């Protein structure tokens, strides 16, 4: 196979991996955690994954501490945690 063909194949495989939905078994365990505002007192609008609704939702983060179920964008939350 030519190098151009290999690059095309690699690109297609990468695209497929990016677009493949995450099943519940492949979801990172931190997606199962409840949102934590943390110990600081800022009032930052953030996104967390809600396991019960299988949706990303808004919560307010204090700015420090908390856990990894804390995203700055909807896309980041969906890509990481939402199973279809």
Swiss-Prot record:
Residues 31-81 form the BPTI/Kunitz inhibitor domain. It comes from the Eukaryota. It is found in: Secreted. Residues 1-24 form the signal peptide. The keyword Plastid does not apply. Expressed by the venom gland. One of its GO terms (molecular function) is toxin activity. GO terms for biological process: venom-mediated suppression of fibrinolysis in another organism. Its main location: secreted. Serine protease inhibitor that inhibits plasmin (90%) (Ki=0.19 nM), trypsin (70%), FXIa/F11 (37%) (Ki=6 nM) and FXa/F10 (20%), and prolonges the activated partial thromboplastin time. This antifibrinolytic property has been confirmed by a fibrin plate assay. Shows less antifibrinolytic activity that aprotinin. In vivo, reduces the bleeding time in a murine bleeding model, and prevents the increase of fibrin(ogen) degradation products in coagulation-stimulated mice. Negative results: does not inhibit activated protein C (APC), in absence or presence of heparin. This is due to the absence of heparin-binding motifs. Consequently, heparin is unable to enhance the inhibition of activated protein C (APC) by this protein, as it does for DrKIn-I. Does not inhibit tissue plasminogen activator (tPA/PLAT) and urokinase-type plasminogen activator (uPA/PLAU). Does not prolong the prothrombin time. This is Kunitz-type serine protease inhibitor DrKIn-II.
């Amino acid at each position: 196979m030519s190098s151009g063909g290999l690059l095309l194949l690699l690109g297609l495989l990468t695209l497929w991996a990016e677009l493949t939905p995450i099943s519940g078994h492949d979801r990172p365990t931190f997606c199962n955690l409840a949102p934590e505002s943390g110990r600081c007192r800022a009032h930052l609008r953030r996104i967390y994954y809600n396991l019960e609704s299988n949706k990303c939702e808004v919560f307010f983060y204090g700015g420090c501490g908390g856990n990894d179920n804390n995203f700055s964008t909807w896309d980041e939350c969906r890509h990481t945690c939402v199973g279809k």
